[in-house]
């Protein structure tokens, strides 16, 4: 068996879609294991950008199976829209498989998400208002509706009626909000279920059979480790587990079948939404990185917060996700800077620490300790090997690997497939 997990090591938007697309060339099955349409990934093929939110990046390889696993929360409306988008672009989706155990996002989840966020006022989390959190809440409360339920007219009607009655009481009594109509939701979403029915199956069987047959399986995470509900900057996190361990729960594949974990990061750091960000930049350098790196959310369109590379964050991600290989993206964005900085540790109340505090009040007091390196002025977007990089850029790449403590397998100097450079084949090393 041969399997590789791709995880984001920062706060999402690290370029996982691109690296997954790149690694998919040598995989036979590509599976997503958590999150929902709150995550966005951009793939560039022959200069054309494709933006996806639910469907795995592997969909662009028609001969390979693409899986939406049981750990994903699926908005059928968004999924049908994304399928239509791909079909209009001439992309076949016959290779898509959707877990019958995946949870369904319904309109009351989205309305509740908005109401809860508004009620928090200044303490808002910065949610994408996609209904992700409320859907996972229902899953944990054992009242969620699964894809298998959506396809059964009687079961869907019964469970929707019960859930909607409870949610409407909540909307009216607690939030003084408008109740939702059962008939409208039932008719619309049952129809969506029938549209996606052809793709639905027990995906754990597909994945385990593939691994047992010696096929190469690639698991694609959404968001990033620092948004993990257990290991991230709680409560400013998502509602699932992007860490590599989330694969086993979200796909139905046991931990003994995972071989490699590729951590994806940018040569700097970015974050969408609220929450701690020790190396955040508020000056013209930060603005320059944001504009050159096109740092605006794929899902929200919001400007991303940007900062220097944080090796404290990266070592935390390496530890909790068991990262074996590193993919360093967007090195080209730093071109033109006289100096570049890497955070090597924090100063907490006068004491140097090299771990990421769980206590947010302590984290607010952490000041980054930087190591400065000379920058480079050259345009590196056409570089196709480590040796072709300017010396200062090459030294930067090597220093990142040293500080994180993981060997760098690939580095990227732009968004295109051809701009990803291999230092070590992840598949060949298994």
Curated annotation (Swiss-Prot):
Residues annotated as binding IMP: 13-16, 38-41, 128, 142, 223, 238, 302
Pfam families: Adenylsucc_synt
Positions that bind GTP: 12-18, 40-42, 304, 330-332, 412-414
Reaction(s) this enzyme catalyzes, per UniProt: IMP + L-aspartate + GTP = N(6)-(1,2-dicarboxyethyl)-AMP + GDP + phosphate + 2 H(+)
Chief location bin: cytoplasm
PROSITE patterns, per the entry: ADENYLOSUCCIN_SYN_1, ADENYLOSUCCIN_SYN_2
Documented EC number(s): 6.3.4.4
Active-site residue list: 13, 41
Presence of keyword Transmembrane: no
Cofactor names: Mg(2+)
Listed GO CC annotations: cytoplasm
Keyword check for Transferase: no
GO terms, molecular function: adenylosuccinate synthase activity; GTP binding; magnesium ion binding
Subcellular location: Cytoplasm
GO BP term (any one): 'de novo' AMP biosynthetic process
Top EC class of this enzyme: ligase
Keywords per UniProt: Cytoplasm, GTP-binding, Ligase, Magnesium, Metal-binding, Nucleotide-binding, Purine biosynthesis
Co-factor: note: Binds 1 Mg(2+) ion per subunit.
PANTHER family: ADENYLOSUCCINATE SYNTHETASE (PTHR11846:SF0)
Summary of the function given for this chain in its UniProt record: Plays an important role in the de novo pathway of purine nucleotide biosynthesis. Catalyzes the first committed step in the biosynthesis of AMP from IMP.
Official protein name in the record: Adenylosuccinate synthetase
Taxonomic placement: Bacteria, Bacillati, Bacillota, Bacilli, Lactobacillales
